[in-house]
Amino acid sequence: MASNCEKMLSKIKIPLPDMLNAVLDLDSSAVIIDQIKNLIKICWSKEEMDRLRNSAGGDKEVLGKCEEIFGELMMVPRIEPKLRVFAFKVEYPSRVSDLKMWMHTIIAATKEITGSVKLFRIMQTSLTMQVLRGSNVECGLDSLVKLCDNVYLMHDFCKLLDFGNDLVHLEAASRIELETITNKMQELFDIEEEVNDEFLASENDGANFVGYRNVVHDFLCTIDGDKQLLNILYAEVGGLVNSYIAEYPSGVRFKEATNILTRFVETFYKSREEIERQAEAEKEILEKRKMNIKQNGNL
């Protein structure tokens, strides 16, 4: 246990008082988050500190460092919750930024999919083909990629060949799990609850911690404002996705639909390139034939 303490302490590169001041100011510019996480790991209880003393053996130097830092940490009321609030504050902007980006991407992709006239025409053709073959119309999404194997249809789609330009957010949306968004949203709500608990508990910390309470209060206001916006985006995502997925059989998930559409776009463009190569090859053959006929006619 003492050796573990030594390893953790070796990773803390700035004076502990400076670090604690940064924590109480929620000033992420002065401290590396990994150092805070290492401090959280050594916020032991009294019983754990007693075990540390017993396990230190003859290594008094290591034990002395651990006891010194432990003593300084314990001078701050509820030091571990305060360190956790600081860690939340450091990571919070990227958490919110990721959620906003993911939800804006899904919203944009869903609107592009449902608003693309060219994609609608291609889907209608796919469904018509299935009806003519006596297939289950509800499985149109699964058979969409097979359209690319039909050269004649691909020629008929010549006016639609750039339909992928309508779906600029599709590929990015296909990599996003709606479940991940839900889980990350819940994590933010849990963080808000933990920060609020620490804010309420800090009311009895005394005059030396008034500044700390003020910055935590400001942090809570930021969380509350972001939460309102994220809830609006989340509701919009849910409404758009549910409306779009309702067009398909039960059990089809949004990620499955976007993955199939992404594959279709990729396959469609590969088929288009193959058709263009074939057309170019046929053109060269025709030109050679014309050249041969012309040469034979001049003999």
Curated annotation (Swiss-Prot):
InterPro entries of this UniProt entry? FH2_Formin (IPR015425), FH2_Formin_sf (IPR042201), Formin_homology_domain (IPR051144)
SUPFAM superfamilies in the record: Formin homology 2 domain (FH2 domain)
The record's GO molecular-function terms, alphabetically, read: actin binding
* Highest taxon of the lineage: Eukaryota
Tell me which residues make up the FH2 domain: 1-295
Instruction: Identify one Pfam family in the record.
Output: FH2
Q: Which family does it belong to?
A: Belongs to the formin-like family. Class-II subfamily.
User: What PANTHER family does this protein map onto?
Assistant: FORMIN-J, FORMIN-LIKE PROTEIN 14
Name of this protein = Formin-like protein 12
Source organism per UniProt: Arabidopsis thaliana
